[in-house]
UniProtKB/Swiss-Prot annotation:
One of its GO terms (biological process) is proteasomal protein catabolic process. ATP binds at G182, C183, G184, K185, T186, L187, H321. InterPro entries: 26S_Proteasome_ATPase, AAA+_ATPase, AAA_lid_3, ATPase_AAA_core, ATPase_AAA_CS, NA-bd_OB-fold, Nucleotidase_PAN, P-loop_NTPase. Gene3D superfamilies: 1.10.8.60, Nucleic acid-binding proteins, P-loop containing nucleotide triphosphate hydrolases. This is Proteasome-activating nucleotidase. Homohexamer. The hexameric complex has a two-ring architecture resembling a top hat that caps the 20S proteasome core at one or both ends. Upon ATP-binding, the C-terminus of PAN interacts with the alpha-rings of the proteasome core by binding to the intersubunit pockets.
Length: 397
């Protein structure tokens, strides 16, 4: 009996020891967890104290560097204020401090304490296209030669500049796309932007025309400055005839401001390095009214005509716009043959209208008859509109 009590007593003692060891491990784990939480909270407290300290700092003045002196000093000018000779803080990188740089000045000592980014008009920042266009070269039909010339002038210098170095020639600075409306000029620029890993800046010529003197020219200058900072860059100026029309001797105040904007554009295109990673593409429907200075070599070196598509081009465009459509017994060559004089935009509208006719008839496929009715609706409406305009001009002059 005694031996049994001793065994029971020993077993209970061992179980109690095991329980205590397990409890110790649990407490040690809790301690490590609490220590980790403490370190995290201390880091958060330190960050918040630093943030509070920064928020309590007095505001700094913004100024412009006029001249950098040798002995860690510089001449700066506060906006619309006097000039000061001030100290340069030791953490400022001297090689980045140049005349014209925007800097932050300490409120008490006026010392330069920070380099500020270049000032830009908010509208210039809005010109940048953040998301790449989804248009590819396969989405453009009937313009193989024009696309090849555009890629040689824009894509090749950006991707393989060493080829031009080896041959010993300068790549084109700019490309002008001209031709009737709806023939794919903007589409070509989008396709290039999609295939080149570059910043794409799109601006319409009329957006550069401003009310007050010098604003348009300043906008053009800031546009090219942003392009250099974000290089490689493609600048696409649509409807360039809004600022690039021929200059006349007799001009009004508004026309003079447009001329100033044009002259700034000419100066910017002359100024940047042709082997630099900034390329300019422009598009217009009216090449006949453009200023000759804009078209001379060294500015827009390559002029690419984008004409109305011929039979083969119309057939290729129709294939592009119908490749996702459910067609039944449709001969696209017949549609291409009867749409002579139609632009790429007209052909896209015809494909869309043919699909609409099928939807009206509660069908999930498109037939030849749908396309014939669409041709009559799209091109017939254009002819009727042209006749109405001609009759109006005859009646009212």
């Amino acid at each position: 009996m005694g031996s049994f009590d001793e065994v029971s007593h020993d077993t209970g003692y061992e179980d109690y020891i095991t329980f205590l060891k397990r409890r110790i491990r649990q407490l040690e784990l809790q301690v490590r967890t609490l220590e980790a939480d403490k370190e995290r909270l201390e880091r958060e407290l330190s960050r918040l104290r630093t943030e509070m300290s920064r928020l309590r700092q007095p505001p700094a003045f913004a100024g412009t560097v006029i001249e950098v002196l040798d002995d860690d000093r510089a001449i700066v000018q506060n906006y619309n204020g006097p000039r000061f000779v001030v100290r340069i803080a030791p953490w400022i990188e001297r090689d980045k401090l140049k005349p014209g740089s925007r800097v932050a000045l300490d409120q008490r000592t006026m010392a330069i304490v920070e380099l500020l980014p270049t000032e830009k008009d908010p509208s210039v920042l809005g010109f940048e296209v953040i998301e790449k266009p989804r248009v590819t070269y396969q989405d453009i039909g009937g313009l193989e030669r024009q696309l090849a010339e555009l890629r040689e002038a824009v894509e090749l210098p950006l991707k393989h500049p060493e080829l031009f170095e080896k041959v010993g020639i300068e790549p084109p600075k700019g490309v002008l796309l001209y031709g009737p409306p709806g023939c794919g000029k903007t589409l070509m620029a989008k396709a290039v932007a999609n295939h080149v890993n570059a910043t794409f800046i799109r601006v319409v010529g009329s957006e550069l025309v401003r009310k007050f003197i010098g604003e348009g020219a300043r906008l053009v200058h800031e546009l090219f400055e942003m392009a250099k900072e974000k290089a490689p860059t493609i600048i696409f100026i649509d409807e360039i005839d809004a600022i690039g029309a021929k200059r006349m001797d007799e001009t009004t105040g508004g026309e003079r401001e447009v001329n100033r904007t044009l002259m700034q554009l000419l100066a910017e295109m002359d100024g940047f390095d042709p082997r630099g990673n900034v390329k300019v593409i422009a598009a217009t429907n009216r090449p006949d009214i453009l200023d000759p200075a804009l078209l001379r070599p060294g500015r827009f070196d390559r002029l690419i005509e984008v004409p109305l598509p011929d039979f083969r081009g119309r057939l290729e465009i129709l294939k592009v716009h119908t490749r996702k459509m459910n067609l039944r017994n449709v001969d696209l060559s017949i549609i291409a043959d009867i749409t002579e004089g139609a632009s790429g935009a007209d052909l896209k509208a015809i494909a869309t209208e043919a699909g609409m006719f099928a939807i009206r008839d509660r069908r999930t496929y498109v037939t030849q008859e749908d396309f014939l009715k669409a041709v009559d609706k799209v091109l017939g409406a254009e002819k009727r509109l042209a006749q109405a305009i001609a009759m109006h001009e005859v009646m009212y002059g």
